[in-house]
A protein has these predicted regions:
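Structural alpha/beta surface segment adjacent to cysteine/selenocysteine redox centers
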Residues: 22-126, 211
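C-terminal cap of thioredoxin/glutaredoxin-like
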Residues: 3-10, 14, 20-34, 38, ...
Length: 216
């Protein structure tokens, strides 16, 4: 008998820790017994809702906000990414962009059973391929490989009603107390924040699979 679990995952595309956290989550899922099936539902969150349409220079923003050398701040996430087999060089993606359209097409991929794969693909395009994910054409190219017709993807990511729904969900996540991402909710039973070590994800699933927890 298949045991079904669910993970609600709150991320923002332009958050390097979200990329790392998603990789670690997926590794933990891949290591589960074959009779355990995990649904991952991605939810929108905005690291900075005030980012202008043209984006901002990440290095300048970090230096202005924190008064530190961006290379120094990038060192830790890059090192953590390497531990999980991800070759991350944050200096090669100099700009942070608005993510409403990326979140919208990701949200709408849920009905096509490609949502988590699409979310990962967009994050990888941004951080690893250094693509401009504020560009509709770039997003449409990625979506076309995950169950969307290209023209349909362009229409949906620019639909004012769909964008408004995404905005409402992102605001609701913040209002529920989520202050940083990645943020994980495991089967509605407990939550975890941050790109924790891989063994922490493994322990979380082991806890969920305990008979006394499963019956709650």
């Amino acid at each position: 008998m298949t045991r079904k679990l669910k993970v609600d995952l709150f991320t923002d595309v332009v958050c390097p820790w979200c990329l790392i956290g998603s990789v670690r989550l997926d590794k933990a899922i891949a290591a589960l017994p074959e009779d355990v099936e995990v649904e991952v539902e991605n939810h929108p969150f905005y690291l900075d809702p005030s980012v202008p349409a043209e984006g901002v220079d990440v290095g300048h923003m970090l230096k202005t906000k924190y008064g530190r050398d961006p290379q120094e701040m990038w060192a830790r996430p890059q090192a953590e990414a390497k531990k999980s087999g991800v070759d991350l060089d944050l200096s090669r993606q100099p700009r942070m962009f608005r993510t409403a359209k990326a979140h919208t097409i990701t949200r709408l991929a849920k009905s096509r059973d490609t949502q988590h794969a699409l979310a990962n693909a967009i994050a990888e395009a941004y951080f690893l391929d250094h693509r401009q994910i504020n560009d509709d054409e770039v997003l449409a190219d990625i979506a076309a490989g995950h169950g969307f017709d290209r023209d349909e993807a362009l229409r949906l990511m620019n639909d004012p009603r769909e964008l408004a729904t995404t905005e409402q969900l992102a605001v609701a996540a913040a209002n529920q107390g989520i202050q940083g991402v990645p943020f994980f909710v495991f089967d509605g039973k407990f939550a975890m924040s941050g790109a924790q070590p891989e063994e922490v994800f493994e322990r979380a699933f082991a806890e969920l699979l305990k008979p006394e927890v499963a019956s709650q």
